[in-house]
Curated annotation (Swiss-Prot):
Ranges for domain Radical SAM core: 142-374
Lineage: Bacteria, Pseudomonadati, Pseudomonadota, Gammaproteobacteria, Enterobacterales
Protein name (Swiss-Prot/TrEMBL): tRNA-2-methylthio-N(6)-dimethylallyladenosine synthase
Binding-site residues, [4Fe-4S] cluster 2: 156, 160, 163
One Pfam family it belongs to: UPF0004
Stored CDD domains: Radical_SAM
Residues binding [4Fe-4S] cluster 1, per UniProt: 11, 48, 82
Catalytic activity: N(6)-dimethylallyladenosine(37) in tRNA + (sulfur carrier)-SH + AH2 + 2 S-adenosyl-L-methionine = 2-methylsulfanyl-N(6)-dimethylallyladenosine(37) in tRNA + (sulfur carrier)-H + 5'-deoxyadenosine + L-methionine + A + S-adenosyl-L-homocysteine + 2 H(+)
Length: 439
């Protein structure tokens, strides 16, 4: 038996890809997963290029693994993910002890690439974009726990000026509807209760069906809701441009779809949205939220924000803060702008100093934290449906689970409840977590 060690950085899509890699290697090459890099025969780094200095982070990690390879030259080092797709053979030029470089769309070829390296002991590289080929090699991953991420589409056609996704994941491709439903059915039989549908632009999903028709995202959600055993549905990440009325209608008639939506806006200034090439305005975004609130009055919204984008004035930033207040976001992921090589925004004049960017980020995050706490306080005394995920790390007498709006809640109960939905009355609130008792 040989052992693989995999380190994963980045988004939920990368986590999903890593689970596919593990399943493929365990099946095809009879490898077993190890938690110790020092004990591994194959070291796999699944990378992310979304943030600043992503490339340097990769080489720092490879430098640490070089010591392992020096002690055991037979160890195979493989680099995959978005940095691998972006950098290609440049990785080998800086780290010539790397054996395999594979892309986001070629991870299914990893077993064959490993065989080649073991036989020939020379670099194997494949960062091509074969459409949907990797899903033809799909093996339902064995899931631990009661929630699962499911990739339904990949890539993006929007080419926002700051984003590398179209270059590292390719253009939008949707998995066949029947394949998605089959995978979810298998997971439901394993005891999975909650499904999170994944895509870089998930609501642009247009999956072909066995009878030659197209299944749109709204229809897919309804079909997933019909699968026995699936009790809760989430999705991420969506784009305002594709948030059409038929998707909003799903919130009216599909109670299994949670009353929580992550809908990235990036800025509250129309000028900055235009520079970002987001192709919508704050008015467009506000209209979507109003329609959603009518369809599902208790819905809560989270978002993404970039501060310090080239050209962002103090007035633009103030508009973003005002927009955050007006929409009343519950949560957000917020970052300082960092230029990504090869994107149009990387050629823009970025003259705002880092100190000012950090100040703006602090103000934005403080504003969001205030709103998050206010949303949490509204939950005090309420009865929440909670999917029990396990025993709390902080207190073995407590169980923990998540509410629809993605807050962790702890409460006392029997371990027999793990994997079940229970009603919990909220007795104590914190900004991002809750304390309750069975109701």
């Amino acid at each position: 038996m040989k052992y693989i060690y995999i380190k994963t950085w980045g988004c939920q899509m990368n986590e999903y890809d890593s689970s596919m890699i593990i399943t493929l290697l365990e099946k095809n090459n009879q490898y077993s997963l190890t938690k110790s890099a020092e004990n591994a025969d194959i070291l796999i780094l699944n990378t992310c290029s979304i943030r600043e200095k992503a490339q340097e982070k990769v080489f720092h990690q490879l430098g640490r693994w070089k010591k392992i390879k020096n002690n055991n030259p037979k160890v195979i080092i493989a680099v995959g993910g978005c940095v691998a797709t972006q950098e290609g053979k440049e990785i080998f030029k800086r780290a010539n002890y790397v054996d395999i470089i594979f892309g986001t769309q070629t991870l299914h070829r990893l077993p064959k690439m490993i065989d080649e390296v073991e036989k020939k002991r020379k670099l194997s590289i494949d960062i091509s974009f074969p459409k949907l080929e990797k899903f033809k090699y799909f093996l339902a991953p064995k899931k631990k726990g009661y929630t699962a991420d499911i990739s339904i589409m990949e890539g993006c056609n929007k080419y926002c000026s700051f984003c590398v996704v179209p270059y590292t994941r390719g253009n939008e491709i949707s998995r066949p509807c029947d394949d998605v439903l089959f995978e979810i059915s298998l997971l439901a039989k394993q005891g999975i209760k909650e499904i999170n549908l994944l895509g870089q632009n998930v609501n642009a999903y247009q999956g072909p069906t066995f009878n030659g028709k197209v299944c749109y995202f709204s229809e897919l959600i309804r079909l997933v809701a019909e699968i026995d055993g699936i009790e809760r549905i989430r999705f991420t990440t969506s784009n305002p441009l594709e948030f059409t009325d038929d998707i909003i209608e799903v919130y009216k008639d599909t109670p299994k779809l949670v009353s929580f939506l992550h809908l990235p806006v990036q800025s509250g200034s129309n000028k900055i949205l235009n520079l970002m090439k987001r192709s919508y305005t704050t008015e467009d975004y506000t209209s979507i939220i109003k329609k959603l609130t009518i369809a599902r009055p208790d819905i809560q919204i989270s978002s993404d924000f970039i501060v310090g984008f080239p050209g962002e004035s103090e007035i633009d930033f103030e508009k973003t803060i005002e927009f955050i207040k007006n929409i009343n976001f519950d949560m957000s992921f917020s970052f300082i702008y960092s230029a990504r090589p090869g994107t149009p925004a990387s050629n823009m004049n970025d003259d705002l100093d880092l100190k000012e960017k950090k100040r703006r980020l602090y103000i934005l995050q403080e504003r969001i934290n205030i709103q998050t706490m206010l949303w949490s306080r509204k939950m005090f005394g309420s009865i929440q449906s909670v999917l029990v995920e396990g025993v709390s790390d902080k207190n073995i007498m407590d169980l923990y689970g998540r509410t629809e709006n993605n807050r962790v809640v702890t409460f006392q109960g029997s371990s027999k409840m793990i994997g079940q939905f229970v009603n919990v009355k909220i007795k104590k609130v914190h900004t991002h977590s809750l304390k309750g008792e069975l109701f």
